[in-house]
Amino acid sequence: MRIAVTGASGVLGRGLTARLLSQGHEVVGIARHRPDSWPSSADFIAADIRDATAVESAMTGADVVAHCAWVRGRNDHINIDGTANVLKAMAETGTGRIVFTSSGHQPRVEQMLADCGLEWVAVRCALIFGRNVDNWVQRLFALPVLPAGYADRVVQVVHSDDAQRLLVRALLDTVIDSGPVNLAAPGELTFRRIAAALGRPMVPIGSPVLRRVTSFAELELLHSAPLMDVTLLRDRWGFQPAWNAEECLEDFTLAVRGRIGLGKRTFSLPWRLANIQDLPAVDSPADDGVAPRLAGPEGANGEFDTPIDPRFPTYLATNLSEALPGPFSPSSASVTVRGLRAGGVGIAERLRPSGVIQREIAMRTVAVFAHRLYGAITSAHFMAATVPFAKPATIVSNSGFFGPSMASLPIFGAQRPPSESSRARRWLRTLRNIGVFGVNLVGLSAGSPRDTDAYVADVDRLERLAFDNLATHDDRRLLSLILLARDHVVHGWVLASGSFMLCAAFNVLLRGLCGRDTAPAAGPELVSARSVEAVQRLVAAARRDPVVIRLLAEPGERLDKLAVEAPEFHSAVLAELTLIGHRGPAEVEMAATSYADNPELLVRMVAKTLRAVPAPQPPTPVIPLRAKPVALLAARQLRDREVRRDRMVRAIWVLRALLREYGRRLTEAGVFDTPDDVFYLLVDEIDALPADVSGLVARRRAEQRRLAGIVPPTVFSGSWEPSPSSAAALAAGDTLRGVGVCGGRVRGRVRIVRPETIDDLQPGEILVAEVTDVGYTAAFCYAAAVVTELGGPMSHAAVVAREFGFPCVVDAQGATRFLPPGALVEVDGATGEIHVVELASEDGPALPGSDLSR
């Protein structure tokens, strides 16, 4: 079916388009301005609804029209003349059905629909609330104050999710009779309740002022909206909104938080990180016409790979692969990748370098190649260029997030983005950068605790909503919670982008004040250290109880035995799982397994730690007196970063549980073969299932298997070719070099570890992995040392290793390919050298993970 959407740039227009495309329909949108997020798979006509020729072009070939173009008040040019254009074009092109997003203020338009002789439905929406509302409703309620004249007037609302679902049904269900239907969430609000939830004071303002101030006049129009009877919606349509009025308001607070409305615009507060509500499409051409292209060779690119602008050619896997090892699942592409891209939008809005550079940062700070994550080094150069009086290369190298591997390729290619040419303009840019740097450093530092506390509360609320009778949620409710959880994860990554900017800035300042690379201790409240602390607490408890020691020494499953013979220790394990159960290896991969899913893994880690040599106490970093204030701020920001990361992983854990529940339901309904098929759909596809679900899942599973054998290089410029699947392993006497994070010299046998083989690691072995995240850190307790191919000194796992004194080397390029499994190696955590002492004997036990592919 082909569907024309008027008002396509609005909240409803964009949402409808995404849902309709997911279900396999063709969409053409018409609006005055094309949204940056408009998908390339949908047509778009940039024109006013009053342009009869453009409207007729949009209607040509359409089976049905979603008429979302209307304005507040009684503007005949849009509401009447525009609708007349649409109806005339439908009559001339043969389009026989129209769905209009109406309201109590649109009786004349509804009469036009009734008189036109076509099939029509007018969905009279109550005031639309929701976290992704970014229109006039957001601007009105983001005003610094709200008038108190109608404080106790009742107002009805509806969530944008419910509005979009009902509109899709009205568009596609042709047996629905023509006529209007009222849509409002159960329950009622008052303007006083709304103002209190949004933190806006209500002040007495006289009627003359209300009429003169445009925003207040619009609020007065809302006050006069009649209450709607939703009996028809419930009894004839059988539709029950997933959100009640109070929940709509709670969700809408996320749209207003960190923003203020002034005049006809909404601004983000400089000390808060606001919700990113819309992401630019990565495949759209730049404003100057340069079209992006895929960087990989024919047949090596994945469905979700990022086309790149040739003027921004250099990409690096270091650090970002810690977040999500690849090839990741499609579900992760719509959760973690979306979140990282939203973080890029946040960075672009903060730094504002303007022009194609700002747009590039917003679109491709993070990119995907062969379904693996990469960071844009060329864009990072321009981010660093906003720091006054410093060379960009110095800023990037001293940020702590990248290793020396980033220096192996040039930042620019044959084409370069435009730059400031005159000296005067460069000086003006420097003055501007001083202001931007100062506002971001001071503002974000000051607002960081509030952002973190608010996010913790958001995730706690999500968990309560999700796990309150999870199995009994109806499908609409479950789908809305899935979208809410996804968006909380996305906002977690936006907060992470703020932490990235602040941590990088503090690292550069510390480097300048100390004259060397300095990493201050984060202190005892480091949330990412909880897995290590949990293992250490359980080890201490086990050593106090001989029964526990005996049971942990036995093979096989131990948890049930502990429940019977050592109930106190069993309770301690369950208590630790309550704290860290959401974490685990590859913890931001949607299809991954957490400690809560496999508690025996945590018990086995405790048993192995009992047999390991304790790590020495880490040395206390020496901070010069002049640098101590900055070091304290840096440590606080580091702790904030880890809290945000922990809550974001918690939100992923909740989302994973919600998806598995929906996967179970679709398996019972015969849509899926197994519940885990749900991870091979995008989250947005879950709420608008594609036509051939089983075929799509099978194709994506096959693509993931194919991409597992196609590994892009760690760093490349312009284009990439797959890395060789095998390489000559190091021999005895050879040395591999990386970046030393912590610890002295230790010896042990090499164990190549991946998320699914973490259980194979034995006490005293060297944990060698492509990348480690915080979910691996419980295994640090019994590994002799940790070596990773990717990551920087400020990566999450490196921070934990430094806090506890675990020997650790990061950015050891090719470690999983060059270090022979089972070889005895000496790791120097200070210098970053890994020296091969002797190879594994031929008659010795073979260690798993001996393939040499990265």
From Swiss-Prot:
GO molecular function annotation: transferase activity, transferring phosphorus-containing groups
GO cellular component term of the entry, any: peptidoglycan-based cell wall
One matching Pfam family: Epimerase
InterPro entries (UniProt xref): Epimerase_deHydtase, NAD(P)-bd_dom_sf, PEP-util_enz_mobile_dom, PEP_Utilizing_Enz, Phosphohistidine_dom_sf
Top-level taxon in the UniProt lineage: Bacteria
Family recorded in the similarity comment: Belongs to the PEP-utilizing enzyme family.
Species for this entry: Mycobacterium tuberculosis (strain ATCC 25618 / H37Rv)
Protein's recorded name: Uncharacterized protein Rv2047c
